[in-house]
Each structure stands twice: as structure tokens, then as C-alpha cells.
């Protein structure tokens, strides 16, 4: 059993590739259930955002896990494996655990410390629970990821003054126009990204805001909160001819604004430039728009320069979060180690309770005149004796699981108590950890915790 991450993000794939491999939120449950049917996949969670698509899986073998996840991605999006492979990254075991914690804390985001990703991790976790695509390992691991992210926000300043992609879009507009107080901004899409853009625009004292959304009521609700004007989608072309700035994030599967629409709007603009930022994945705006005179088109990847300036200021704080993550990884490993001793403890309890039950049957045969109350008291007290006798051996077995020679000692433990452990898949195997010379032990993870792998 191994933990594996297969995915791509803004560092490994440009936006034109990411948009081809992006899951709709409504697809996540179906995708996870489908992936669960693949050979080698024991547990899985899919996380898909504008900047990343990642599959987290518990697999029985790393090489087969990689193969079937790559095949699943290619099949789901109608691509060839060879077209997908160059953009994929792989993390294994402790590298996978560390990566998840970094993602949840916002350390792996384009915008260091952003908190939106935590909500997306929690959302995917909830879907996986509903679809029953996860078990013991991921239930524990993802709860811990949420916990470490909350700790990073509470115990450090990583989330303070963190810019968002929407903030970066507004900053880019400010760099081009200087001041925004006399500009007309069109926000296309009333989702979370559109809301963040509206907040940042309000902070910059924007002159006029128009919100257009496929659902007019949502446009009206968002516009009302930021003193803007809502409009329906059929007014899009007319508004394009009036606005100075467009920030788009609809989540549509096809282009919402085409080159022809911008060319048509351009005829009424009298030479005024139109600045457009497409922060949607898949993209809302046809890349061919950049060929139109007076139209300046930027996508989410063009915002990295602005984000980089923010990154410098946040590196010291990020180091504090890294220390938290290191401690949480150790805690997860310790928990994982205890899984190896679970079947041993279960076998010990089962044997003791069998002896107690046989003893009670013998007493009942030899002392048939005992009342029901007397038998109940005897049953209670004999079980109490069993629990007291088992307490120290069980605690010792748990301590043994974390020791360097755990496998040898647990074998001796089983021999002493003559235990028959049926679940051989849960047997304890040594794990060589790269940091230091000690070994950890956990159920059926013979390859151990490896760092990020390449393929």
C-alpha cells in the first residue's frame, strides 16, 4: 500500500493544457467513483482548481497506480496518454503527504498563503466521503491536512495580506491605467473569483462596475453589494463597447467572448483600448482576441510577475509553516505505524474474550443454580479482569510498532501469546526513511516514504 499523487499545475502546464484537464465541480463525484473501479486504486480524491488538477490515491503498487491514473486522465478528457504525460508530476508516500499539506496551507499556490484552496480541498474531501471513495488512510490524512492548514492560518501570518489571483488582475489593470477612479470595469461571472475582483476594485476606488452573469439574479446580488450595475448575458456585446476593463471568470466550457465579438465592439469604441484579464480555467476569452487592434488580452499565467513580488515578502512566514508541516508529517507517520499493530491487538483481544466466554459457559454448566443477576455480575467482573490484564500488553505492542526492530518484536509478541493474525495484508513491513538511519513500520508499505518522483 502506497500514497500517490499524480497531477499537473501552473508550474508544469500552461493554461491551454490545464483547461483541457480540468474537472467541473459537478463531475468530481462521478470521476472519483469511476477512478475507484480502476485496478490498483484503493482510495482516491480528485482536486481540480484553476491552477491545478491532482489525483490523490492510495494504491497497492506504485507503478500500476501511476499507469492506471494516467490512463484514467487521458480517457476522461479524450486524450492520448502520451499527450498528458509530459505535464504530469508525481509524489510518492512522504512526498505525497508533504505535498498535500503544502497545498492545503497555500504554500504550493501561485499566490502564497491564499485561503481559497483550503475550501477546495475540503469540498473534494466531502465529495469523496459522500461517494465512499476513501477509507481509513485518507479519512485521517485529509482531516489532518485541514487541521494543519487551520493551524498555519492561526499561528502564522501566512494568510495575512495574501494577494489573490483576482487581486493580481486588478493590480495589473492599475499598472496599465494608473488610476481606476475614472474607469468602467465589466466583471463577467458572479462566482468567488468575480466577488474577489469586485472587492479589490472597490478598494481601488473604481469609477463604475458592471456585473454580467449567466444567471441575472446572481449578477444582481453581487452588483448590489459593491454599488455596481447588473446586466443580463444578452447585453454582453453592448457592454464590451462601453467598458475599459474586463475581468472574466465564468467557468464555462467554451469561449464566452470571441474575436468577432471584440471586433464588433471595437467599431464603437472610437480607438479606446480594451484591457481584458481572463482568470478562468478553462479560458473564457478566445486567444485570437489578442490580434484585434486596441485589445490587450492577459490570461491567468500572465499574472505571475505580480504574484512574484508578493512572494518575496512571504518567504519568511512560509518557513514557519514548513516547520508546522514537518511536525504534522511525523505525526501522520506515527499514526500510520500504529495500523500495523491493529490486527495483532485485535487478535489478542479476540483470544482473551474467547477464553472469557468459554469460562462463563463452563461456570454456567457447573453452577446451574446461579441466578441471571449473579451470572451477569460474573460476566462483568471476568471481563474487567481481562481488560486489566490486556492493558499493559496492548500499550507495549503500540510502543513496539514505533521501534526500529518492530517486525521482529511483534513476531515474538505473537508467539508469546500464540496469536493467529488472519489479515496478512495488514502485516507490518519495514520502511526505510531517507532522513536519518532509522526505520519506520507500517502496514504493507514496503517501499517506504519516498520524495517527489519524476517520470
Swiss-Prot record:
Organism name: Bacillus pumilus (strain SAFR-032)
Amino-acid positions noted as binding NADP(+) in the UniProt annotation, renumbered to this chain: 189-194
Pfam families documented for this protein: GlutR_dimer, GlutR_N, Shikimate_DH
Taxonomic lineage: Bacteria, Bacillati, Bacillota, Bacilli, Bacillales
Sequence positions that bind substrate: 49-52, 109, 114-116, 120
BP terms from Gene Ontology: protoporphyrinogen IX biosynthetic process from glutamate
Subunit description: Homodimer.
Protein name per UniProt: Glutamyl-tRNA reductase
PANTHER family: GLUTAMYL-TRNA REDUCTASE
Amino acid at each position: 500500500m502506497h500514497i500517490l499523487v499524480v497531477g499537473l499545475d501552473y508550474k508544469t502546464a500552461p493554461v491551454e493544457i490545464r483547461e483541457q484537464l480540468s474537472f467541473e465541480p459537478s463531475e468530481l463525484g462521478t470521476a472519483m467513483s469511476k477512478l475507484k473501479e480502476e485496478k490498483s486504486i484503493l482510495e482516491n480524491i480528485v482536486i481540480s482548481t484553476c491552477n491545478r488538477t491532482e489525483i490523490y490515491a492510495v494504491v497497492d503498487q506504485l507503478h500500476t497506480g501511476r499507469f492506471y491514473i494516467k490512463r484514467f486522465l487521458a480517457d476522461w478528457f479524450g486524450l492520448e496518454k502520451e499527450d498528458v504525460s509530459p505535464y504530469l508530476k508525481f509524489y510518492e508516500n512522504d512526498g505525497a503527504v508533504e505535498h498535500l499539506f503544502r497545498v492545503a496551507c497555500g504554500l504550493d499556490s501561485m499566490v502564497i498563503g491564499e485561503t481559497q484552496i483550503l475550501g477546495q480541498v475540503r469540498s473534494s474531501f466531502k465529495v469523496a466521503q459522500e461517494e465512499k471513495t476513501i477509507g481509513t488512510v485518507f479519512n485521517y490524512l485529509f482531516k489532518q491536512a485541514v487541521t494543519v492548514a487551520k493551524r498555519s492560518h492561526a499561528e502564522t501570518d501566512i494568510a495575512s495580506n495574501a494577494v489573490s489571483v483576482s487581486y493580481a488582475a486588478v493590480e495589473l489593470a492599475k499598472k496599465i491605467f494608473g488610476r481606476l477612479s475614472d474607469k468602467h470595469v465589466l466583471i463577467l461571472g458572479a462566482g468567488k473569483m468575480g466577488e474577489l475582483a469586485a472587492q479589490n476594485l472597490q478598494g481601488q476606488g473604481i469609477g463604475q462596475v458592471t456585473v454580467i452573469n449567466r444567471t441575472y439574479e446572481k449578477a444582481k446580488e453581487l452588483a448590489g453589494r459593491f454599488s455596481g450595475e447588473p446586466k443580463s448575458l444578452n447585453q454582453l456585446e453592448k457592454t464590451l463597447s462601453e467598458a475599459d476593463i474586463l475581468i472574466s471568470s465564468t467557468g464555462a466550457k467554451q469561449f464566452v467572448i470571441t474575436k468577432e465579438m471584440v471586433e464588433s465592439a471595437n467599431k464603437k469604441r472610437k480607438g479606446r483600448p480594451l484591457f481584458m484579464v481572463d482568470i478562468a480555467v478553462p479560458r473564457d476569452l478566445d486567444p485570437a482576441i489578442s490580434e484585434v487592434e486596441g485589445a490587450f488580452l492577459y490570461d491567468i499565467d500572465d499574472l505571475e510577475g505580480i504574484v512574484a513580488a508578493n512572494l518575496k515578502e512571504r518567504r519568511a512566514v512560509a518557513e514557519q509553516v514548513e516547520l508546522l508541516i514537518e511536525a504534522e508529517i511525523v505525526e501522520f507517520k506515527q499514526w500510520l505505524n500504529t495500523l500495523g499493530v491493529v490486527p495483532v491487538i485485535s487478535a489478542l483481544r479476540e483470544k482473551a474474550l474467547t477464553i472469557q466466554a468459554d469460562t462463563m459457559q463452563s461456570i454456567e454448566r457447573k453452577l446451574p443454580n446461579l441466578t441471571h443477576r449473579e451470572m451477569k455480575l460474573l460476566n462483568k467482573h471476568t471481563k474487567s479482569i481481562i481488560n486489566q490484564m490486556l492493558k499493559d500488553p496492548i500499550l507495549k505492542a503500540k510502543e513496539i510498532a514505533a521501534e526500529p526492530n518492530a517486525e521482529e518484536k511483534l513476531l515474538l509478541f505473537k508467539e508469546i501469546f500464540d496469536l493467529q493474525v488472519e489479515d496478512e495484508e495488514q502485516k507490518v513491513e519495514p520502511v526505510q526513511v531517507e532522513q536519518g538511519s532509522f526505520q519506520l513500520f507500517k502496514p504493507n508499505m514496503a517501499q517506504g516514504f519516498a520524495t517527489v518522483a519524476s517520470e
